[in-house]
A protein has these predicted regions:
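Secretory/extracellular carbohydrate-interaction modules
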Residues: 133-195
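Beta-strand-rich interaction surfaces with strong enrichment in secreted/lumenal proteins
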Residues: 140-147, 206-212, 241-242, 252-253
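Carbohydrate-binding surfaces in secreted/extracellular proteins
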Residues: 156, 214-243, 266
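Short, aromatic/His-centered strand-loop micro-motif at the edge of beta-sheets
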Residues: 196-219
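Flexible glycan-contacting loops in extracellular carbohydrate-active proteins
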Residues: 240-267
Length: 292
């Protein structure tokens, strides 16, 4: 719509001036009489909606003056904004990526979703999830969920306790894909052996050999974007790349070798590229002596 037609049309829509607010997407809005303007929705407060015109002016009108379709759009938009505002945020700023929408969240206090809790013994409580390897299984304890992932940020808390190792593992539709492993004295990310019969082999990334307190919770964050993987807990960082990591992830979850380990507050976000990573990532790789 031409700007010189907007003032007249605003009067037809019953618009009044309002203060500046955070803008939504630009789209066409139609009132109950069939008149249309192009504007951004900036707020929905009670029975009023605020719209920002392409000329920069902002106005408020009764929501009921719009078409039923636009009223429903406005309500849904506000619900989405409220969900974004209340969604969990990473505890520290990710390195390689930026978080988009939350696609999974659980405090791990109760069974939620389609977790497979075997082998091993897994229990939920108000303190979170615990897993322990059982000697009779002759295999590490595994609890995984089938849910496709692509480029993501994964964050959770882990309590090592007396366990030998606690891991977060990711599989593709064929086999193991990658994992992050914590022990009482090490932290490492790796690309897994994806075929077990060759030619593919496990590819460990840089190992951080530092003592990790076993009676304290550690926040672990995993970033996966294309062929790259970055894992961090505290100041400890392990990273690397491999073409396998760019594949769609089909299944993911926790692995425990040895005695009881605890987990809580698992959140997964869709990940977007961080424009600064090309520069900051190169510096970090040099610092960690990791090949580009």
């Amino acid at each position: 719509m031409k700007l010189h037609h907007q003032t007249h049309l605003l009067l037809l829509l019953g618009l009044t001036f309002t203060s500046g607010l955070i803008a939504g997407e630009t789209r066409d809005w139609t009132n109950s009489a069939g008149k249309t303007i192009t504007a951004e929705m900036t707020a929905l407060s009670g029975d009023d909606i605020s719209l920002k015109m392409t000329n920069g002016r902002e106005y408020t009108i009764p929501l009921s003056s719009l078409s039923e379709k636009d009223q429903n759009f406005a309500r849904k938009w506000m619900e989405e904004q409220a969900a974004v505002a209340s969604a969990p945020k990473p505890k520290t700023e990710p390195l390689m990526t930026t978080p988009d929408k939350v696609i999974y969240h659980s405090e791990l206090k109760a069974m939620e979703g389609s977790w497979r809790t075997s082998p091993g013994k897994w229990e939920f409580s108000e303190s979170g999830l615990t897993g322990v390897e059982l000697a009779a299984d002759d295999h590490a304890a595994v609890m995984k969920q089938a849910m496709p992932l692509k480029d993501v940020i994964i964050e959770f808390d882990v309590l090592l306790g007396n366990t030998t190792s606690a891991m977060f593992g990711i599989d593709d539709d064929k086999d193991h894909m990658c994992r992050v492993t914590l022990t009482s004295n090490s932290f490492q990310a790796r690309k897994d052996d994806n075929d077990h019969e060759g030619p593919d082999l496990s590819k460990p990334f840089n190992t951080v050999s530092e003592e990790l307190e076993t009676d304290e919770w550690h926040t672990v964050r995993i970033e996966l974007l294309g062929e790259e993987m970055v894992a961090q807990t505290g100041e400890h960082i392990s990273l690397g790349s491999d073409p396998l990591l760019a594949k769609e992830k089909a299944k993911w979850g926790f692995i425990v070798s040895g005695d009881t380990a605890g987990f809580r507050n698992l959140t997964i976000w869709e990940a977007l590229p961080n424009e600064e990573w090309e520069k900051t990532g190169s510096r970090l790789k040099r610092k960690l002596d990791v090949e580009e």
